């Protein structure tokens, strides 16, 4: 997989990171900066927290959610084993703005995959989001910070105002992308978004 370059990411202070770690461990939701907007996230195997994300967004639970990670190792347990050719294909695109649909392992909660048998995963190239995943020691559910059908939120302040105490909002800067990630089904090669 490609390695990221550029300036070192700004990260929330260690106290705020400890609060974020506790929030996730306790089944809570955080808001954090990503490539194109703020995202809402939780631990990917915590079905209760995933349902909380869906409720905050008023998002239908059949759609499924994306998981981002700092590297493939953080998502390996979420997907069925991949062939060497499939891993090589992913390495061509990651880290980067490409989300792939991969066959989900049995461990993946239905609330995360929705009505699908695959899971949407991305190794992010956004320095702050990748560093956050590393520091928190987990991949993160990543869905735009907004209510379904509304504009994605672009600042920590907007998230704090919108979600109040339902979400722990971390300071950060969104990336320069204006569109959401491209979604590709790895098995068929079909571009879905």
Curated annotation (Swiss-Prot):
Transmembrane segments: none annotated. It is an enzyme of class 2 (transferase). GO terms for molecular function: ATP binding; double-stranded RNA binding; L-threonylcarbamoyladenylate synthase; tRNA binding. The keyword Cell membrane does not apply. Residues 14-193 form the YrdC-like domain. It is found in: Cytoplasm. It catalyses: L-threonine + hydrogencarbonate + ATP = L-threonylcarbamoyladenylate + diphosphate + H2O. It comes from the Bacteria. Required for the formation of a threonylcarbamoyl group on adenosine at position 37 (t(6)A37) in tRNAs that read codons beginning with adenine. Catalyzes the conversion of L-threonine, HCO(3)(-)/CO(2) and ATP to give threonylcarbamoyl-AMP (TC-AMP) as the acyladenylate intermediate, with the release of diphosphate. This is Threonylcarbamoyl-AMP synthase.
